[in-house]
Regions:
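Extracytoplasmic/periplasmic solute-binding protein
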Residues: 31-32, 164
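A structural signal for short loop-to-beta-strand junctions that line the ligand-binding cleft
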Residues: 92, 123-176
């Protein structure tokens, strides 16, 4: 009996080790499946929920096209707030969380963000031939761009997009822009340029 238990003991131990290793590998693979781009919308403007749900696959298609990579994953969230104060509070929370790469929100909220340095210099990713309305900080640095008459905003179900602006959050490692930040800049450039030239 003891001999048989001793014989099977190693089989049991090996089986446990294999199961544990499999779980570790599975968790590492699934955890690496984080998004390549995270967008958040915060506004008091009218938002059509169904249109907004459709934004994720469409942004992913744009990501894949821009990066020439079919494995790209996008994450999109929206918060429809009741007042300008609620929009500002939510936007500050989203920025502090570090979860998002690009932000679309009401103009008034962007104007009241005290630390403008949390946003990338918008002149880096704005098409040079575009005529847009911008928000500038005290140093004359552009940090948010208007989406007025923007076809993508309308496509996403944001009907009243006159007062909406877009900005890219600063994300760096060792002084260099992260891949996610570069993606956010590229996609934001496309969105800004989508009045009639690029329609998803």
């Amino acid at each position: 009996m003891e001999t048989r238990l001793g014989y099977y003991k190693w089989h049991i131990i090996i089986a446990i080790v294999v199961i544990v290793c499999s779980l570790v590998i599975y968790n590492s693979v699934t955890s690496d499946k984080e998004s390549d781009l995270s967008f958040v919308f915060v506004s008091t403007k009218y938002m059509n929920t169904q249109y907004f749900k459709d934004a994720k696959p469409e942004l992913e298609l744009l990501l894949k096209d821009v990066n020439h990579d079919s494995s790209r994953v996008a994450d999109v969230k929206a918060f429809a707030e009741k007042s300008e104060g609620d929009v500002l509070k939510r936007l500050e929370e989203c920025i502090a969380s570090g979860e998002y790469d690009a932000y679309i929100a009401d103009k008034q909220a962007f104007e009241q963000i005290r630390d403008k340095s949390v946003f990338e210099d918008a002149s880096v990713y704005i098409p040079s031939n575009e005529k847009n309305e911008y928000l500038e900080d005290s140093d004359g640095r552009l940090y948010a761009v208007s989406l007025k008459d923007n076809s993508l905003a309308k496509r996403l179900g944001i009907i009243e997009n006159d007062g909406l602006y877009i900005a890219v959050g600063v994300k760096t490692e060792n002084g260099e822009r992260t891949g996610k930040m570069k993606n956010a800049m590229n996609i934001s450039g496309y969105i800004i340029n989508s009045r009639d030239k690029y329609k998803m």
